[in-house]
Curated annotation (Swiss-Prot):
SUPFAM superfamilies: MetI-like (SSF161098). This is Arabinooligosaccharides transport system permease protein AraQ. It comes from the Bacteria. The keyword Membrane applies. The chain crosses the membrane at residues 8-28, 79-99, 110-130, 140-160, 184-204, 245-265. GO terms for biological process: transmembrane transport. Residues 75-264 form the ABC transmembrane type-1 domain. It is a multi-pass membrane protein. It comes from Halalkalibacterium halodurans (strain ATCC BAA-125 / DSM 18197 / FERM 7344 / JCM 9153 / C-125) (Bacillus halodurans). InterPro entries: MetI-like, MetI-like_sf.
Protein backbone atom coordinates (compact mmCIF):
# COMPACT_ATOMS: atom_id res chain seq x y z
CA UNK A 1 0.00 0.00 0.00
CA UNK A 2 1.35 3.39 -1.00
CA UNK A 3 2.03 5.64 1.98
CA UNK A 4 0.65 9.18 1.73
CA UNK A 5 3.03 12.08 2.13
CA UNK A 6 2.24 14.59 4.85
CA UNK A 7 0.93 17.92 3.47
CA UNK A 8 3.32 19.80 5.74
CA UNK A 9 6.26 17.75 4.46
CA UNK A 10 5.15 18.39 0.87
CA UNK A 11 5.02 22.13 1.49
CA UNK A 12 8.43 22.10 3.15
CA UNK A 13 9.93 20.17 0.25
CA UNK A 14 8.32 22.52 -2.27
CA UNK A 15 9.64 25.59 -0.45
CA UNK A 16 13.09 24.02 -0.16
CA UNK A 17 13.29 23.11 -3.85
CA UNK A 18 11.97 26.56 -4.82
CA UNK A 19 14.69 28.19 -2.71
CA UNK A 20 17.39 26.02 -4.30
CA UNK A 21 16.01 26.81 -7.76
CA UNK A 22 16.07 30.53 -6.98
CA UNK A 23 19.70 30.31 -5.87
CA UNK A 24 20.56 28.55 -9.14
CA UNK A 25 18.64 31.04 -11.31
CA UNK A 26 19.63 34.19 -9.39
CA UNK A 27 23.01 34.81 -11.15
CA UNK A 28 21.41 34.36 -14.59
CA UNK A 29 18.50 36.65 -13.70
CA UNK A 30 20.92 39.24 -12.35
CA UNK A 31 22.98 39.05 -15.55
CA UNK A 32 19.96 39.50 -17.82
CA UNK A 33 18.61 42.50 -15.90
CA UNK A 34 22.04 44.13 -15.65
CA UNK A 35 22.52 43.83 -19.43
CA UNK A 36 19.68 46.33 -19.92
CA UNK A 37 21.23 48.95 -17.63
CA UNK A 38 23.56 51.75 -18.81
CA UNK A 39 27.20 51.85 -17.79
CA UNK A 40 26.73 54.85 -15.49
CA UNK A 41 24.02 53.04 -13.54
CA UNK A 42 26.19 49.92 -13.23
CA UNK A 43 29.17 51.92 -11.98
CA UNK A 44 27.05 53.79 -9.45
CA UNK A 45 24.96 50.96 -7.98
CA UNK A 46 26.77 47.82 -9.14
CA UNK A 47 25.19 44.61 -10.44
CA UNK A 48 22.20 44.17 -8.16
CA UNK A 49 18.50 43.40 -8.38
CA UNK A 50 17.70 46.65 -6.57
CA UNK A 51 17.77 49.47 -9.14
CA UNK A 52 15.62 52.10 -10.81
CA UNK A 53 13.49 50.35 -13.50
CA UNK A 54 13.32 53.59 -15.49
CA UNK A 55 17.02 53.22 -16.31
CA UNK A 56 16.48 50.04 -18.33
CA UNK A 57 17.45 50.51 -21.97
CA UNK A 58 18.10 48.54 -25.15
CA UNK A 59 21.11 50.67 -26.09
CA UNK A 60 23.59 47.95 -25.12
CA UNK A 61 22.03 45.41 -27.48
CA UNK A 62 21.55 48.02 -30.21
CA UNK A 63 25.26 48.78 -30.00
CA UNK A 64 26.14 45.10 -30.38
CA UNK A 65 23.86 44.65 -33.40
CA UNK A 66 24.88 47.87 -35.17
CA UNK A 67 28.40 48.91 -34.17
CA UNK A 68 30.22 45.99 -32.52
CA UNK A 69 31.39 44.36 -35.75
CA UNK A 70 34.23 42.48 -34.07
CA UNK A 71 31.74 40.88 -31.69
CA UNK A 72 30.08 39.09 -34.60
CA UNK A 73 33.49 38.03 -35.90
CA UNK A 74 34.14 36.38 -32.54
CA UNK A 75 30.63 34.95 -32.58
CA UNK A 76 31.19 33.41 -36.02
CA UNK A 77 34.55 32.00 -34.93
CA UNK A 78 32.93 30.30 -31.94
CA UNK A 79 30.10 28.89 -34.06
CA UNK A 80 32.46 27.52 -36.70
CA UNK A 81 34.90 26.01 -34.19
CA UNK A 82 32.09 24.47 -32.12
CA UNK A 83 30.45 22.86 -35.16
CA UNK A 84 33.73 21.37 -36.39
CA UNK A 85 34.64 20.07 -32.93
CA UNK A 86 31.20 18.52 -32.41
CA UNK A 87 31.16 16.77 -35.80
CA UNK A 88 34.71 15.43 -35.59
CA UNK A 89 34.41 14.50 -31.92
CA UNK A 90 31.20 12.56 -32.48
CA UNK A 91 32.68 10.75 -35.46
CA UNK A 92 36.04 9.71 -34.02
CA UNK A 93 34.98 9.28 -30.38
CA UNK A 94 32.06 7.07 -31.37
CA UNK A 95 34.36 4.95 -33.53
CA UNK A 96 36.87 4.52 -30.70
CA UNK A 97 34.18 3.80 -28.10
CA UNK A 98 32.45 1.35 -30.43
CA UNK A 99 35.72 -0.49 -31.11
CA UNK A 100 36.52 -0.75 -27.39
CA UNK A 101 33.06 -2.17 -26.70
CA UNK A 102 32.55 -4.55 -29.62
CA UNK A 103 35.90 -5.84 -30.86
CA UNK A 104 38.10 -8.17 -28.85
CA UNK A 105 41.69 -7.25 -29.68
CA UNK A 106 44.98 -7.38 -27.84
CA UNK A 107 45.45 -4.41 -25.54
CA UNK A 108 41.77 -3.42 -25.50
CA UNK A 109 41.60 -3.23 -21.70
CA UNK A 110 44.86 -1.29 -21.60
CA UNK A 111 43.55 1.30 -24.05
CA UNK A 112 40.33 1.65 -22.09
CA UNK A 113 42.33 2.08 -18.87
CA UNK A 114 44.39 4.74 -20.65
CA UNK A 115 41.19 6.57 -21.58
CA UNK A 116 40.07 6.50 -17.95
CA UNK A 117 43.45 7.79 -16.75
CA UNK A 118 43.43 10.68 -19.24
CA UNK A 119 39.85 11.42 -18.21
CA UNK A 120 40.99 11.93 -14.61
CA UNK A 121 43.95 14.18 -15.47
CA UNK A 122 43.14 17.93 -15.40
CA UNK A 123 43.58 19.57 -18.79
CA UNK A 124 45.87 22.22 -17.27
CA UNK A 125 48.50 19.51 -16.71
CA UNK A 126 48.37 18.48 -20.37
CA UNK A 127 48.27 22.03 -21.67
CA UNK A 128 52.02 22.73 -21.62
CA UNK A 129 53.09 19.62 -23.60
CA UNK A 130 50.19 20.22 -25.98
CA UNK A 131 51.31 23.80 -26.53
CA UNK A 132 54.90 22.67 -27.17
CA UNK A 133 53.56 20.17 -29.70
CA UNK A 134 51.58 22.92 -31.45
CA UNK A 135 54.73 25.05 -31.65
CA UNK A 136 56.68 22.19 -33.27
CA UNK A 137 53.84 21.59 -35.73
CA UNK A 138 53.67 25.36 -36.43
CA UNK A 139 49.97 25.42 -35.60
CA UNK A 140 50.00 28.29 -33.10
CA UNK A 141 47.48 31.01 -33.99
CA UNK A 142 45.45 28.63 -36.14
CA UNK A 143 42.03 27.13 -35.60
CA UNK A 144 43.57 23.69 -36.09
CA UNK A 145 45.40 24.11 -32.78
CA UNK A 146 42.07 24.77 -31.05
CA UNK A 147 40.22 21.90 -32.74
CA UNK A 148 42.84 19.14 -32.79
CA UNK A 149 43.01 18.33 -29.03
CA UNK A 150 39.21 18.09 -28.86
CA UNK A 151 38.70 15.62 -31.71
CA UNK A 152 38.82 12.55 -29.46
CA UNK A 153 37.46 13.46 -26.03
CA UNK A 154 38.01 10.85 -23.27
CA UNK A 155 34.58 11.51 -21.74
CA UNK A 156 32.95 10.97 -25.15
CA UNK A 157 34.90 7.75 -25.75
CA UNK A 158 33.86 6.43 -22.34
CA UNK A 159 30.23 7.42 -22.90
CA UNK A 160 30.01 5.83 -26.36
CA UNK A 161 31.77 2.70 -25.15
CA UNK A 162 29.23 2.25 -22.36
CA UNK A 163 26.36 2.80 -24.78
CA UNK A 164 27.78 0.46 -27.42
CA UNK A 165 28.02 -2.38 -24.88
CA UNK A 166 24.23 -2.63 -25.03
CA UNK A 167 23.91 -2.73 -28.81
CA UNK A 168 22.54 -6.03 -30.19
CA UNK A 169 25.43 -8.05 -31.58
CA UNK A 170 22.96 -10.20 -33.52
CA UNK A 171 22.57 -7.32 -35.98
CA UNK A 172 26.31 -7.33 -36.57
CA UNK A 173 26.36 -11.07 -37.21
CA UNK A 174 23.41 -10.81 -39.60
CA UNK A 175 25.08 -7.95 -41.47
CA UNK A 176 28.32 -9.91 -41.82
CA UNK A 177 26.39 -12.87 -43.24
CA UNK A 178 24.86 -10.50 -45.80
CA UNK A 179 28.36 -9.41 -46.82
CA UNK A 180 28.43 -6.01 -45.12
CA UNK A 181 31.86 -4.63 -44.27
CA UNK A 182 32.84 -3.56 -40.76
CA UNK A 183 32.65 0.09 -41.79
CA UNK A 184 29.23 -0.53 -43.29
CA UNK A 185 28.05 -2.20 -40.09
CA UNK A 186 29.15 0.79 -38.05
CA UNK A 187 27.92 3.61 -40.28
CA UNK A 188 24.73 2.02 -41.62
CA UNK A 189 23.53 -0.03 -38.64
CA UNK A 190 25.20 0.74 -35.33
CA UNK A 191 25.69 4.50 -35.63
CA UNK A 192 21.95 5.18 -36.20
CA UNK A 193 21.20 3.06 -33.13
CA UNK A 194 23.50 5.33 -31.13
CA UNK A 195 21.34 8.36 -31.97
CA UNK A 196 20.34 9.29 -28.39
CA UNK A 197 23.93 9.10 -27.19
CA UNK A 198 25.08 11.17 -30.17
CA UNK A 199 22.53 13.88 -29.37
CA UNK A 200 23.52 13.98 -25.70
CA UNK A 201 27.22 14.14 -26.43
CA UNK A 202 26.69 16.73 -29.19
CA UNK A 203 25.18 19.10 -26.63
CA UNK A 204 27.92 18.42 -24.06
CA UNK A 205 30.75 18.80 -26.55
CA UNK A 206 29.13 21.84 -28.12
CA UNK A 207 28.74 23.46 -24.72
CA UNK A 208 32.35 22.71 -23.77
CA UNK A 209 33.77 24.08 -27.02
CA UNK A 210 31.48 27.13 -26.94
CA UNK A 211 32.57 28.06 -23.40
CA UNK A 212 36.21 27.04 -23.80
CA UNK A 213 38.41 29.93 -22.72
CA UNK A 214 41.82 28.74 -21.53
CA UNK A 215 43.09 26.70 -24.49
CA UNK A 216 42.04 29.17 -27.25
CA UNK A 217 43.61 31.95 -25.14
CA UNK A 218 46.91 30.04 -25.15
CA UNK A 219 47.12 29.20 -28.87
CA UNK A 220 45.37 32.15 -30.55
CA UNK A 221 47.16 35.46 -31.05
CA UNK A 222 45.21 37.53 -33.61
CA UNK A 223 42.32 39.61 -32.31
CA UNK A 224 40.10 38.74 -35.27
CA UNK A 225 40.64 35.02 -34.64
CA UNK A 226 39.49 35.09 -31.02
CA UNK A 227 36.51 33.07 -29.90
CA UNK A 228 33.63 34.77 -28.11
CA UNK A 229 34.78 34.16 -24.49
CA UNK A 230 38.25 35.58 -25.23
CA UNK A 231 36.83 38.48 -27.22
CA UNK A 232 34.52 39.46 -24.38
CA UNK A 233 37.44 39.33 -21.96
CA UNK A 234 39.30 41.91 -24.08
CA UNK A 235 36.57 44.41 -23.20
CA UNK A 236 38.05 44.49 -19.69
CA UNK A 237 41.16 46.69 -19.83
CA UNK A 238 43.19 48.68 -17.27
CA UNK A 239 42.07 51.89 -19.00
CA UNK A 240 38.33 51.33 -18.88
CA UNK A 241 35.74 48.59 -18.64
CA UNK A 242 32.69 48.43 -20.88
CA UNK A 243 30.58 46.54 -18.37
CA UNK A 244 27.33 47.37 -20.14
CA UNK A 245 28.52 45.97 -23.48
CA UNK A 246 30.20 43.03 -21.73
CA UNK A 247 26.99 42.04 -19.95
CA UNK A 248 24.87 42.39 -23.09
CA UNK A 249 27.41 40.35 -25.04
CA UNK A 250 27.39 37.67 -22.34
CA UNK A 251 23.61 37.39 -22.59
CA UNK A 252 23.87 37.03 -26.37
CA UNK A 253 26.46 34.29 -25.80
CA UNK A 254 24.00 32.26 -23.73
CA UNK A 255 21.16 32.42 -26.28
CA UNK A 256 22.47 29.80 -28.80
CA UNK A 257 23.11 27.24 -26.05
CA UNK A 258 19.66 27.78 -24.53
CA UNK A 259 17.99 27.39 -27.95
CA UNK A 260 20.02 24.25 -28.66
CA UNK A 261 19.06 22.68 -25.35
CA UNK A 262 15.37 23.58 -25.73
CA UNK A 263 15.14 21.81 -29.08
CA UNK A 264 17.24 18.77 -28.12
CA UNK A 265 16.55 18.36 -24.40
CA UNK A 266 14.42 15.25 -24.99
CA UNK A 267 17.26 13.50 -26.84
CA UNK A 268 19.79 14.82 -24.34
CA UNK A 269 17.97 13.38 -21.32
CA UNK A 270 17.22 10.11 -23.13
CA UNK A 271 20.85 9.73 -24.19
CA UNK A 272 22.21 10.31 -20.70
CA UNK A 273 19.62 8.02 -19.12
CA UNK A 274 20.17 5.11 -21.50
CA UNK A 275 23.93 5.61 -21.70
CA UNK A 276 24.20 5.66 -17.93
CA UNK A 277 22.73 2.17 -17.49
CA UNK A 278 24.39 0.39 -20.41
CA UNK A 279 26.99 -2.25 -19.63
Amino acid sequence: MKRKTSPILSWLLTIGFAFIAFIAVFPLLNLILASFRPSTELMRNGITLIFDPSTLTLDNFIYIFTEAGLYWTWFGNSVWISIVIVVLSLLFSSMVGYALAVYDFKGRNFFFLLVLIILMIPFEILMLPLFQLMIKLQLVNTYTAVILPAIVAPIAVFFFRQYALGLPKELMDAARIDGCTEYGIFFKIMLPLMGPSLAAMAILQGLNSWNNFLWPLVVLRSNDMFTLPIGLATLLTPYGNNYDILLAGSVMTIVPIVILFIFFQRYFIAGLTVGGVKG
